[in-house]
Regions:
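Central hydrophobic cores of alpha-helical transmembrane segments in multi-pass inner-membrane proteins
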Residues: 36-47
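Alpha-helical transmembrane segments
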Residues: 23-36
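Non-transmembrane, membrane-proximal soluble domains of secreted or membrane proteins
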Residues: 1-25, 45-278
Length: 278
């Protein structure tokens, strides 16, 4: 209840209820602290006002109640952190779905949009190299790599199937961004030179807002996108449409790599996705 009051959108992922429970507990705990300490503050203002105590008392409070209250607050916070927050975060970080079951998507952030790279029917990502980056090829897909001929590249909007785990591997072309999908209760930094995985399982069809949660420049306010959760049939139709529009994800004409260097395979292969417990 308090989460909705504070503006949190309805949960649309399988794990989101765990996040919501701990957030709601924290909010109620903070509310209790706020009203409790506010009442104590008002009591002190009245109890020790100048008219009743014209001379300052340098000994202070002689009762041990305040000390007990402080220790109780510290104990509750320690239980909340060690008993709930850390185990929940450990499960989110370490227990990835099996690679064969999950949809693997590379999310490449740039000022000021999110680009998505999906493998084609062969299940393999094509090579990417900065030497091939252009306005028509924002991810630098190697046009000479057979594995990338059927790849799908899209910007701003990503479609995923409902009830299927998704692993998003985050990276960036320029500065640090943060890929945040509030309805899915996931977020992660997109850092140049790093590949940072986050995962979730969408359980409700619909369109959900994607935002950048890291100040990344003058256009940060407009760095938004859409995550569309489809039925399996609609998702397959979208894949077919994107494959036709992108011509297999490849730019029309090949361009050589600068300096005659051989392009490197930048993205990780699908089999490299983290496995449960690792």
């Amino acid at each position: 209840m308090i989460n909705e009051f504070l503006g949190q959108p309805p949960n649309a992922s399988s794990h989101g209820y765990q996040i919501d429970h701990i957030l709601e507990f924290c909010h109620w705990f903070m509310a209790a602290l706020f009203f409790g300490w506010s009442a104590f503050f008002i009591f002190v203002l009245i109890r020790f006002r100048k008219r009743v105590h014209p001379a300052a008392d340098h000994l202070g409070v002689r009762s041990g109640i305040s000390t007990h209250l402080e220790f109780s607050v510290v104990l509750i916070e320690a239980v909340l952190l060690l008993g709930f927050a850390i185990p929940l975060w450990a499960r989110r970080v370490n227990q990835f779905p099996p690679g064969r079951d999950a949809l693997l998507v590379h999310v490449v952030a740039q000022q000021f949009s999110f680009n998505y790279h999906l493998p084609g029917p062969d299940g393999q990502f094509g090579r990417r190299d900065v030497g091939f980056v252009s306005n028509s090829n924002p991810l630098g897909l190697d046009p000479n790599d057979p594995a990338g001929k059927d790849d799908i590249v899209t910007s701003g909007e990503l479609h995923v199937p409902v009830n299927r785990p998704m692993v998003a591997e985050l990276s960036s072309k320029d500065v640090i961004h943060d890929y945040f999908v509030p309805a899915m209760r996931i977020g992660g930094d997109a850092i140049p030179g790093s590949l940072i995985p986050v995962w979730f399982t969408p359980v409700k069809t619909g369109s959900y807002e994607v935002i950048c949660a890291q100040l990344c420049g003058l256009g940060h306010y407009g760095m938004k996108g859409t995550l569309v959760v489809d039925t399996p049939q609609d998702y397959q139709a979208w894949l077919k449409e994107r494959a036709e529009l992108s011509g297999g994800g490849q730019p029309a004409a090949p361009s050589p790599s600068p300096g005659g260097q051989q392009p490197q395979n930048k993205p990780a292969a699908p089999a490299a996705s983290p496995s449960p417990g690792g």
